[in-house]
UniProtKB/Swiss-Prot annotation:
This is Large ribosomal subunit protein bL28. It comes from Onion yellows phytoplasma (strain OY-M). PANTHER family: 50S RIBOSOMAL PROTEIN L28, LARGE RIBOSOMAL SUBUNIT PROTEIN BL28A. The keyword Ligase does not apply. Coiled coil: none annotated. InterPro entries: Bacterial_rp_bL28, Ribosomal_bL28, Ribosomal_bL28/bL31-like_sf, Ribosomal_bL28_bact-type, Ribosomal_bL28_sf. GO terms for cellular component: ribonucleoprotein complex; ribosome. Keywords: Ribonucleoprotein, Ribosomal protein.
Length: 62
């Protein structure tokens, strides 16, 4: 399963509820973006990062 490299966000499972409160299964997928970053060793690494983490954190991008 896809997972955010920083926050660990993954897919969430739950129910869709109609007006009559009938439940059907649905999923929420994290908004993951492929990003190249420079790690602490100076190596370029391709990782998946959630859009929120990308917005909040100042990463050194390659």
């Amino acid at each position: 399963m896809s997972k955010c490299y920083i926050t660990g966000k993954t897919t969430l499972f739950g129910n869709r509820r109609s007006h009559a409160m009938n439940a059907t299964k649905r999923i929420w997928k994290a908004n993951l973006q492929n990003v190249k970053i420079v790690d602490e060793n100076g190596k370029v690494q391709k990782v998946k990062i959630s859009a929120r983490a990308l917005k909040k954190l100042k990463l050194q991008r390659a």
